[in-house]
Amino acid sequence: MTQNQEDFIALIKPEAIKIYHKYKVLPSLTIAQAILESDWGTSILAIEANNLFGIKWTDGCGCDYVVKQTKEYISNQWITIDAKFKKYNSVNDSIIDYALLLQNPRYEKVLNAKDYKEAAFEVWQAGYATDSNYPQKLIEQIEKFELYKIDNEVLSSINIKDFDQVANWAKDAVKKVVDKGIMIGDDQGFFNPLQPCTRQELAVIVSRLLELIE
């Protein structure tokens, strides 16, 4: 992995984790699509418009746009067309809009995918891209750069090992805050329900809550 590639993943990873907890898009898929669609953030669209995902502009969307040539695979051949693409104020705005796009009912199977391979296939099947090799290209990026490990991080934080030690009256609340990423278990996957919370830990919890609200 080059330094530029490492920096790009580090740039995308925090927001990718955040949108998983809020919108259920696997972080590996988010990062892999950003890599493919923006060529590691070096595409003209990424540089001029902060658009990492090749999301097109539509009338009434409330965004500015840039016009760029793009290739579409139609009737078994590649053709070049001029298209309008959304222009964002920041990279994070682009990531959030991508997550919102995947809330469309046609992407329901992407959000319910059990792993990155299924998610990669379903996002293509739902019409995100016309390239028939798109799923494999996503999977190759995820496996080459071990992006699935980020999925494992967020999923392990949800499956806490000592959930049976949580009082019945608190189980729903604990499940909700862990699922949303507001509170997580320790490195071994234990929630430690009876352990006291320090002021600095409380600050982290409140910060995560504020991020979800924002």
Segments and roles (model prediction):
Residues 1-155:
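Catalytic cores of secreted/periplasmic lytic hydrolases that degrade extracellular macromolecules
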Residues 155-214:
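Short, solvent-exposed alpha-helical surface patches in non-cytosolic proteins
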